[in-house]
């Protein structure tokens, strides 16, 4: 009876874990709901591993990292290039995450960003972050709870990074105001039908960049009265796609520009 009780207990734990992982895989929020309007560029990949892995073999990367000011990153790059890491099944699964990263600039050309990572079924772990991270007591990370909003802040050399899990997603930003807008989780409602079609469009290349043409042009011509006249060519809501893949043998580029 004792052994049978242990067996039932273990089966119960396995069942609870299975249900929790299934729930985490099904209870989803789309990344675009966390991306505020008016970005300069939005970088998307369906798999971080598939996007980054080919870049590790580029000969150009060796030349770039051979410079003295990149010496701090050379060791990290060599370790990442190691087959033991790249072919590790657990690492592959962990890095096969959808990533969206949106870049913004204000009127003073200060840059900010929102990064949204879709952990899928692995969000069974990230959903517990508010309980796990305080226990780990990681240096520089503090949990904030104010006005009903709880999130984490990572302080590094005077810079603050804000992050929080939302269902299957983890949101990261260096700008608190943008971070709060992202956490409303309804930003997808602010895009029109044409924009959503562009944002959700699949590409054959591993990396897709969605550009707000007017926002980018404005950042370059805002002080030039003559060039600013060309700004009217671009619709306020028009988005364009640049997707690409890079190997030593070839660079693949695709453009999708509305006219």
Task: Report the location of each language-model feature.
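Generic beta-strand structural signal
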Residues: 105, 143-146, 163-166, 173, ...
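Short solvent-exposed loop/turn micro-motifs enriched in small/polar/acidic residues
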Residues: 145, 153-157, 237
């Amino acid at each position: 009876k004792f052994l049978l009780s242990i067996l039932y207990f273990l089966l119960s734990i396995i069942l609870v874990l299975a249900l929790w992982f299934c729930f985490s895989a099904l209870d989803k929020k789309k990344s675009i709901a966390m991306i505020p309007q008016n970005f300069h560029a939005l970088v998307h990949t369906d798999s971080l591993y598939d996007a980054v892995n080919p870049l590790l073999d580029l000969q150009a990367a060796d030349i770039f990292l051979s410079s003295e000011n990149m010496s701090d990153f050379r060791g990290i790059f060599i370790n990442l290039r190691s087959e033991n890491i790249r072919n590790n099944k657990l690492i592959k699964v962990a890095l096969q995450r959808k990533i969206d990263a949106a870049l913004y600039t204000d009127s003073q050309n200060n840059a900010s960003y929102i990064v949204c990572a879709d952990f899928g079924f692995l969000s069974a772990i990230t959903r517990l972050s508010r309980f796990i991270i305080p226990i780990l007591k990681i240096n520089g990370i503090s949990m904030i709870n104010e006005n009903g909003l709880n999130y984490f802040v990572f302080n590094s050399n005077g810079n603050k990074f804000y992050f929080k899990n939302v269902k299957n997603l983890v949101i990261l930003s260096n700008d608190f105001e943008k971070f709060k807008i992202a956490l409303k989780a309804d930003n997808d409602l602010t895009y029109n039908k044409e924009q959503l079609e562009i944002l959700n469009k699949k590409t054959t290349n591993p990396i897709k960049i969605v550009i707000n043409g007017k926002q980018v042009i404005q950042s370059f011509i805002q002080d030039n009265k003559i060039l600013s006249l060309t700004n009217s060519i671009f619709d306020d809501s028009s988005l364009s796609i640049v997707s690409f893949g890079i190997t030593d043998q070839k660079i693949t580029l695709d453009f999708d520009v509305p006219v």
